[in-house]
A protein has these predicted regions:
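Glycine/proline-enriched, intrinsically flexible loops and inter-domain linkers
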Residues: 1-191
Length: 191
Protein backbone atom coordinates (compact mmCIF):
# COMPACT_ATOMS: atom_id res chain seq x y z
CA UNK A 1 0.00 0.00 0.00
CA UNK A 2 1.04 3.60 -0.53
CA UNK A 3 1.89 5.20 2.78
CA UNK A 4 3.80 8.43 2.27
CA UNK A 5 4.99 10.95 -0.27
CA UNK A 6 8.02 13.11 -0.90
CA UNK A 7 8.57 16.38 -2.72
CA UNK A 8 11.81 17.99 -3.90
CA UNK A 9 11.70 21.35 -5.65
CA UNK A 10 14.13 23.84 -7.08
CA UNK A 11 13.37 27.52 -7.46
CA UNK A 12 15.17 30.82 -7.52
CA UNK A 13 14.99 33.10 -4.49
CA UNK A 14 11.28 33.61 -3.68
CA UNK A 15 12.03 36.78 -1.69
CA UNK A 16 13.26 38.66 -4.77
CA UNK A 17 11.13 41.63 -5.79
CA UNK A 18 8.42 40.97 -8.37
CA UNK A 19 10.03 43.71 -10.46
CA UNK A 20 13.01 41.40 -11.03
CA UNK A 21 10.87 38.66 -12.57
CA UNK A 22 12.06 37.50 -15.98
CA UNK A 23 9.89 38.65 -18.86
CA UNK A 24 7.20 36.08 -19.62
CA UNK A 25 7.71 34.24 -16.32
CA UNK A 26 5.73 34.15 -13.10
CA UNK A 27 7.33 35.56 -9.95
CA UNK A 28 9.29 32.97 -7.94
CA UNK A 29 7.17 33.66 -4.84
CA UNK A 30 3.98 32.79 -6.75
CA UNK A 31 5.54 29.61 -8.17
CA UNK A 32 6.84 28.44 -4.80
CA UNK A 33 3.59 29.10 -2.95
CA UNK A 34 1.37 27.73 -5.73
CA UNK A 35 3.37 24.52 -6.11
CA UNK A 36 3.44 23.92 -2.35
CA UNK A 37 -0.30 24.50 -2.09
CA UNK A 38 -1.06 22.21 -5.03
CA UNK A 39 1.09 19.39 -3.70
CA UNK A 40 -0.33 19.73 -0.20
CA UNK A 41 -3.92 19.85 -1.44
CA UNK A 42 -3.49 16.79 -3.66
CA UNK A 43 -1.78 14.82 -0.89
CA UNK A 44 -4.54 15.68 1.56
CA UNK A 45 -7.23 14.58 -0.89
CA UNK A 46 -5.48 11.25 -1.43
CA UNK A 47 -4.81 10.86 2.28
CA UNK A 48 -1.01 10.75 2.18
CA UNK A 49 1.46 12.19 4.62
CA UNK A 50 4.37 13.96 2.99
CA UNK A 51 7.37 12.71 4.94
CA UNK A 52 10.02 14.65 3.02
CA UNK A 53 9.81 18.15 1.64
CA UNK A 54 13.05 19.67 0.36
CA UNK A 55 13.11 23.05 -1.31
CA UNK A 56 16.34 24.03 -3.04
CA UNK A 57 16.84 27.71 -3.82
CA UNK A 58 19.43 28.50 -6.48
CA UNK A 59 19.69 31.15 -9.23
CA UNK A 60 19.94 28.44 -11.91
CA UNK A 61 16.23 27.73 -11.35
CA UNK A 62 15.13 31.27 -12.21
CA UNK A 63 14.04 30.41 -15.77
CA UNK A 64 12.81 26.86 -15.18
CA UNK A 65 11.96 25.40 -11.82
CA UNK A 66 12.37 21.80 -10.74
CA UNK A 67 9.50 19.80 -9.28
CA UNK A 68 9.89 16.16 -8.29
CA UNK A 69 7.28 14.17 -6.42
CA UNK A 70 7.08 10.53 -5.47
CA UNK A 71 5.00 8.22 -3.36
CA UNK A 72 6.32 5.29 -1.36
CA UNK A 73 4.53 2.02 -0.93
CA UNK A 74 5.05 -1.34 0.68
CA UNK A 75 3.41 -4.74 0.78
CA UNK A 76 4.07 -7.96 2.66
CA UNK A 77 6.14 -10.35 0.51
CA UNK A 78 3.37 -12.97 0.71
CA UNK A 79 0.93 -10.53 -0.93
CA UNK A 80 3.07 -9.94 -4.03
CA UNK A 81 3.38 -12.38 -6.91
CA UNK A 82 5.61 -12.00 -9.95
CA UNK A 83 4.60 -14.08 -12.92
CA UNK A 84 5.10 -13.91 -16.64
CA UNK A 85 2.17 -12.93 -18.79
CA UNK A 86 0.40 -15.65 -20.75
CA UNK A 87 -1.81 -15.59 -23.84
CA UNK A 88 -5.37 -14.87 -22.76
CA UNK A 89 -4.41 -12.83 -19.71
CA UNK A 90 -6.70 -9.90 -19.06
CA UNK A 91 -5.43 -6.33 -18.91
CA UNK A 92 -7.40 -4.11 -16.56
CA UNK A 93 -7.14 -0.33 -16.73
CA UNK A 94 -7.88 0.95 -13.27
CA UNK A 95 -8.22 4.60 -12.36
CA UNK A 96 -9.47 7.81 -13.84
CA UNK A 97 -10.54 8.14 -17.43
CA UNK A 98 -8.03 9.18 -20.08
CA UNK A 99 -8.14 12.63 -21.65
CA UNK A 100 -6.02 14.93 -23.75
CA UNK A 101 -4.46 16.31 -20.59
CA UNK A 102 -1.13 14.68 -19.93
CA UNK A 103 -0.55 13.69 -23.56
CA UNK A 104 2.98 14.78 -24.41
CA UNK A 105 3.90 15.35 -20.78
CA UNK A 106 7.04 13.25 -21.00
CA UNK A 107 8.54 15.59 -23.57
CA UNK A 108 6.66 18.74 -22.57
CA UNK A 109 8.55 19.18 -19.32
CA UNK A 110 11.78 19.56 -21.29
CA UNK A 111 10.51 22.03 -23.88
CA UNK A 112 11.45 25.68 -24.02
CA UNK A 113 8.43 27.61 -22.80
CA UNK A 114 7.46 31.10 -23.90
CA UNK A 115 4.54 33.46 -23.32
CA UNK A 116 2.75 31.75 -26.22
CA UNK A 117 3.46 28.14 -25.17
CA UNK A 118 0.75 28.25 -22.49
CA UNK A 119 -1.76 28.05 -25.33
CA UNK A 120 -0.36 24.78 -26.66
CA UNK A 121 1.44 23.16 -23.73
CA UNK A 122 -1.10 23.54 -20.93
CA UNK A 123 -2.78 20.29 -21.91
CA UNK A 124 0.46 18.38 -21.34
CA UNK A 125 -0.10 18.64 -17.60
CA UNK A 126 -2.11 15.65 -16.46
CA UNK A 127 -5.18 16.45 -14.38
CA UNK A 128 -5.31 13.84 -11.66
CA UNK A 129 -8.28 12.37 -9.85
CA UNK A 130 -7.43 12.19 -6.12
CA UNK A 131 -10.66 10.50 -4.95
CA UNK A 132 -10.18 7.70 -7.49
CA UNK A 133 -6.50 7.36 -6.62
CA UNK A 134 -7.38 7.04 -2.93
CA UNK A 135 -9.81 4.22 -3.72
CA UNK A 136 -7.11 2.41 -5.72
CA UNK A 137 -4.67 2.71 -2.82
CA UNK A 138 -7.23 1.15 -0.50
CA UNK A 139 -8.02 -1.60 -3.00
CA UNK A 140 -4.35 -2.60 -3.32
CA UNK A 141 -4.08 -2.95 0.47
CA UNK A 142 -6.32 -6.01 0.22
CA UNK A 143 -4.16 -9.12 -0.08
CA UNK A 144 -6.83 -11.07 -1.95
CA UNK A 145 -6.74 -8.36 -4.63
CA UNK A 146 -2.97 -7.95 -4.88
CA UNK A 147 -2.50 -11.72 -5.35
CA UNK A 148 -4.61 -11.58 -8.52
CA UNK A 149 -2.11 -9.28 -10.22
CA UNK A 150 0.74 -10.79 -12.25
CA UNK A 151 2.16 -7.46 -13.38
CA UNK A 152 1.26 -3.88 -12.62
CA UNK A 153 2.26 -0.56 -14.14
CA UNK A 154 1.25 3.07 -13.87
CA UNK A 155 0.57 5.21 -16.89
CA UNK A 156 3.18 7.79 -15.99
CA UNK A 157 4.04 10.18 -18.78
CA UNK A 158 4.21 7.47 -21.44
CA UNK A 159 0.48 6.96 -21.81
CA UNK A 160 -1.58 3.89 -22.60
CA UNK A 161 0.70 2.30 -25.18
CA UNK A 162 3.82 2.48 -23.04
CA UNK A 163 2.14 1.38 -19.80
CA UNK A 164 0.43 -1.61 -21.38
CA UNK A 165 3.28 -2.36 -23.77
CA UNK A 166 5.65 -2.88 -20.84
CA UNK A 167 3.48 -5.69 -19.44
CA UNK A 168 4.02 -8.24 -22.20
CA UNK A 169 6.21 -8.94 -25.22
CA UNK A 170 3.35 -8.91 -27.70
CA UNK A 171 -0.25 -7.88 -27.38
CA UNK A 172 -3.05 -6.08 -29.15
CA UNK A 173 -4.76 -3.12 -27.59
CA UNK A 174 -7.94 -1.57 -28.92
CA UNK A 175 -7.30 2.04 -27.94
CA UNK A 176 -10.85 3.02 -28.89
CA UNK A 177 -12.07 0.94 -25.92
CA UNK A 178 -10.00 2.84 -23.35
CA UNK A 179 -12.39 4.78 -21.06
CA UNK A 180 -12.16 8.48 -21.91
CA UNK A 181 -13.02 11.67 -20.06
CA UNK A 182 -15.00 13.08 -22.96
CA UNK A 183 -16.28 12.24 -26.42
CA UNK A 184 -14.24 12.98 -29.51
CA UNK A 185 -10.95 11.38 -28.50
CA UNK A 186 -9.73 8.59 -30.72
CA UNK A 187 -7.10 5.96 -30.08
CA UNK A 188 -4.34 7.81 -31.89
CA UNK A 189 -4.63 10.79 -29.52
CA UNK A 190 -4.14 8.74 -26.37
CA UNK A 191 -1.58 6.24 -27.66
Amino acid sequence: YVYQAMRVTGAADPTVSVKETLKGKLPQKKLVRGAAHGYSSYGNQIGLATGLVKEIYHPDYVAKRMEIGAVLGAAPRRAVIRENSDPGDIIVLLGGRTGRDGCGGATGSSKVHTEESIETCGAEVQKGNPPTERKIQRLFRREEVSKLIKKCNDFGAGGVSVAIGELADGLRVDLDKVPKKYAGLDGTEIA
